[in-house]
Swiss-Prot record:
Belongs to the heat shock protein 70 family. This is Chaperone protein DnaK. It comes from Leuconostoc mesenteroides subsp. mesenteroides (strain ATCC 8293 / DSM 20343 / BCRC 11652 / CCM 1803 / JCM 6124 / NCDO 523 / NBRC 100496 / NCIMB 8023 / NCTC 12954 / NRRL B-1118 / 37Y). Pfam families: HSP70. Keywords: ATP-binding, Chaperone, Nucleotide-binding, Phosphoprotein, Stress response.
């Protein structure tokens, strides 16, 4: 079975890992980074992903960040490069880039992946993530929750232990807390809670607001009105936040950030950790309630928790760590890298699916209750939150009026008592119900949640056995036709990128060949006659001309490749003549050395060049 990669598709950064030799390993990106910025930009009609996109975010207005915060959002589109894109399409570009460098590392095609999502993602957000994977050319074998993945990474070498684990996961845009029980290789999620709109971006925004307000009061200029200045401010705020994780003060220096009546204006100030803590205190407080709710749902107290695992880059903030320690009464476990644990855990789950990881069972839960709207606008739950998945639940309902010919099934997800206060997942109708008094028809509604947390709903008239089924596709979701079109677009871009890379490689190889041949001719000097050197010199000039002719981006490279092959051939023949000319001399020296009676025999040890890589 082919490799299944594990992808942490994050708000701020993403990561990918694969199982090798029974251990999960992070795959580095082309820039050598172990994580990749979840940033997409467009330049000259072409998309760029990762570090290169993030580096030019300040100067390029067609740059998209934190798209994950809009996954599953009905009707949301972002305009860039003169076109509207859905969150699924932008996320697919990130996934496609990750898939590409994973294939380069593995040396084989990657077609399957386990992708993680925040535990508190609803059905629409999970479906959108799965669609993004499909657009990117990936078969999403499993969607798993980020805290659960982190627990897998933590517990892989502790399968013989019985522990209750609290995972506190504060990422760039989302917050989750999950409580798991680990025993005999079974990772059972007892409860989960969170906030899909709380993360590191919110901490950055607090600093941005503070700096912008301070600058406005001193200079009368609102930096938020200038897109370029605001992006510089965002970068400075994020940098200051990171600095304050290890220092008590961060310097912020942004020269020429704006213009005033008397000339250019500069932002030069400092931010102390104490002030940062003051600015973000409400965010840390906001994260406490989900922890308490998860604990209550699991029927546990803090004294029952054996380990507290921190995950997500934002857990590096000292005030966050202090809050967790104070709340739980335990020193958080720092044995896993908060930026990498989720991808590593996803790779472990990939190994479970392929059978490479034995004796590990993952039992996850649905984060929110599921049900339908009943008479009076009431939300009637069929599946309670924190129910282990996969699961199925049925309940019989009836009509609300005499001779009612059809029933509308309004499917919802949430915890509020009234339907209007919960999230609509979808609607469908069961028609052709035989005329009967109110309350007589028996309509059985069945909810089915698969291993990915994706919901299927059916309604059956038990009298006629007529049935209607739907896989929930929330408002704003993508149709099969839309996904197919986006897949084709993504594939076309992938092919265009491959051609572009081939062109660059061909030109680079030609450059290298020209350089090497010129160097060889220089070394040959007068050791060979002009007639012997002429074929190589002619082929060299022909390649130089072909390179000039193929300078345009859309140029045909056929002639350049042919001229490169010709030069390689004749230059090889020239090198052979040079070698043969030198051989008699070298042979004589060799004979002289073999006659030396003082030759020392050496002991040799065979070295495996791949030994370090196998560790």
């Amino acid at each position: 079975m082919s490799k299944i990669i594990g992808i942490d598709l994050g708000t701020t950064n993403s990561a990918v890992a694969v199982l090798e030799g029974g251990e999960p390993k992070i795959i580095t990106n082309p820039d050598g980074g172990r994580t990749t910025p979840s940033v997409v930009s467009f330049k000259n009609g072409e998309s760029q992903v990762g570090d290169v996109a993030k580096r030019q975010a300040i100067t390029n207005p067609d740059t998209i960040i934190s798209i994950k915060s809009h996954m599953g959002e009905a009707g949301y589109k972002v305009n860039a490069n003169g076109k509207d894109y859905t969150p699924q399409e932008i996320s697919a570009m990130i996934l496609q880039y990750i898939k590409g460098y994973a294939e380069d590392y593995l040396g084989e095609k990657v077609e399957k992946a386990v992708i993680t999502v925040p535990a508190y993602f609803n059905d629409a957000q999970r479906q959108a993530t799965k669609d993004a994977g499909k657009i990117a050319g990936l078969e999403v074998e499993r969607i798993i929750n980020e805290p659960t993945a982190a627990a897998l990474a933590y517990g892989l070498d502790k399968l013989d232990k019985d522990e209750k684990i609290l995972v506190y996961d504060l990422g760039g845009g989302t917050f989750d807390v999950s409580i798991l029980e680990l025993g005999d290789g079974v990772f059972e999620v007892l409860s989960t809670n969170g906030d899909t709109h709380l993360g590191g971006d919110d901490f950055d925004n607090k600093v941005i607001d503070y700096l912008a307000e301070q600058f406005k009061s001193e200079n009368g200029v609102d930096l938020k009105d200038d897109k370029l200045a605001l992006q510089r401010l965002k970068d400075a705020a994020e940098s200051a936040k990171k600095t304050l994780s290890s220092a008590n003060e961060a310097q912020i220096d942004l020269p020429f950030i704006a213009s005033g009546d008397n000339g250019p204006l500069h932002l030069q100030t400092s931010l102390t950790r104490a002030k940062f803590n003051e600015l973000t205190a409400d965010l840390i407080k906001k994260a406490e309630q989900p922890v308490l709710s998860a604990l209550k749902d699991a029927g546990l107290s803090f004294s029952d928790i054996d380990e507290v695992i921190l995950n997500g880059g934002s857990t590096r903030i000292p005030a966050v760590q202090e809050s967790v320690k104070k709340m739980t009464g335990k020193e958080p476990n720092h044995s896993i890298n908060p930026d990498e644990a989720v991808a590593l855990g996803a790779a472990v789950q990939g190994g479970v699916i392929t059978g490479d990881v034995k004796d590990v069972v993952l039992l996850d839960v649905t984060p929110l209750s599921l049900g339908i709207e009943t008479m009076g606008g009431v939300f009637t739950k069929l599946i309670e939150r924190n129910t282990t998945i996969p699961t199925s639940k049925s309940q019989v309902f009836s009509t609300a009026a005499d001779n009612q010919p059809a029933v509308d099934i309004h499917v919802l997800q949430g915890e509020r008592s009234m339907a209007a206060d919960n999230k609509t997942l979808g609607r469908f109708q069961l028609a052709d119900i035989p005329a009967a008094p109110r309350g007589v028809p028996q309509i059985e509604v069945t909810f089915d949640i698969d291993r990915n947390g994706i919901v299927n709903v059916s309604a059956k008239d038990l009298g006629t056995q007529k049935e209607q089924k739907i896989t929930i596709q929330a408002a704003g979701g993508l149709s099969d036709e839309e996904i197919e079109k986006m897949m084709n677009d993504a594939k076309a871009n992938e092919e265009a990128d491959a051609k572009k890379k081939e062109a660059v490689d061909t030109r680079n190889e030609a450059d290298q060949l020209i350089f090497q041949t010129e160097k060889t001719l220089e070394e040959v000097g007068d050791k060979l006659g002009d007639d012997e050197k002429k074929p190589t010199q002619d082929a060299l000039e022909a390649l130089k001309k072909a390179k000039e002719d193929a300078a345009a981006d859309d140029a045909d490279l056929t002639d350049l490749k042919a001229k490169s092959e010709e030069l390689t051939k004749v230059a090889g023949e020239l090198a052979m003549k040079l070698y043969q000319q030198a051989a008699p001399k070298d042979g004589a020296e060799g004979d002289a050395k073999s006659a030396d009676d003082n030759t020392v025999d050496g002991d040799f040890e065979e070295v495996d060049p791949n030994k370090d890589d196998k560790k």
